[in-house]
Design a protein with these regions (language model features):
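Acidic, serine/proline-rich low-complexity intrinsically disordered regions
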Residues: 3-239
Length: 239
């Protein structure tokens, strides 16, 4: 079912209020939507620009983070990553464990050159995007998780994958959307990414395959019915 983007954005803003960050869509293409600029280190800080309304495009030449290139589908996984994650960052007990964890991500290099990020409300109609990323405080997460579980009885309808900020959100969404899956993800627990985001925010990620379903039911959920969510919404949007 195709998403009525304008209606979804309207419903989202009504449900969460003006202080909640709007969803960021992302997709690959052969043509950038903005001039790519070189970024050293993590590219996650540029998502703050996207949140503010600016489109961003990156390719393998402008994204210098080896892991970021890989998890965004712009280049193969660098050979040093498993050892680096284990022996330098100490996030896994061994390089073999890192390799095993990464194997579950089924990483593929996109045939397209660029990865693009743009706020959903500003994106052109007809773009085949992978899903959305939402910067979320604990209160906003409460609403997003409640929304995601509304029509899904699975205990892992919302998952917290191990990995870097981009692997646990961007790569997870790409793969889930390819599988036409129903799982959403919470990311940005990785200590390496934390200094690059607001201290009271994580990232909620929804594949388009799931967003199409969630958009249909949003007005039936607690976000529009009952009194509990309204108290949380008021705290997100104080007078």
């Amino acid at each position: 079912m195709a998403i009525n983007k304008q209606q979804l954005v309207k419903d989202y803003e009504e449900a969460f209020g003006r202080n909640a960050a709007l969803p960021i869509a992302f997709w690959h293409s052969d043509t950038p939507i903005a001039k790519p600029e070189k970024i050293g280190g993590s590219f996650i800080p540029v998502l703050e620009d996207v949140r503010c309304g600016y489109p961003v495009s990156l390719d393998a030449e402008t994204m210098l983070c080896g892991g970021g290139k890989c998890y965004c589908g712009l280049a193969p996984l660098p050979a040093y990553v498993p050892t680096f994650v284990s022996e330098k960052e100490h996030y896994k007990a061994s390089a073999e464990l890192v390799e095993k964890a990464i194997s579950h991500m089924d990483i593929q290099v996109s045939p397209y050159r660029y990865i693009n990020f743009q706020r959903l409300d500003l994106m052109d109609e007809g773009i085949d995007y992978y899903g959305v990323l939402i910067f979320a405080s604990p209160d906003v997460l409460s609403g997003l998780v409640s929304w995601a579980y509304y029509d899904n009885a699975s205990q892992d309808a919302v998952a917290v994958p191990w990995g870097s900020g981009c692997s646990a959100t961007i790569r997870a969404v790409i793969r889930e959307n390819e599988l036409m899956g129903r799982q959403c993800f919470i990311g940005f627990f990785d200590p390496t990414v934390r200094p690059n985001v607001n201290k009271n925010e994580l990232m909620f990620a929804i594949p388009k395959s799931r967003l199409e379903e969630m958009a249909e039911y949003i007005r039936d959920t607690c976000l529009f019915n009952g009194k509990a969510w309204q108290k949380v919404r008021e705290r997100i949007n104080p007078e």
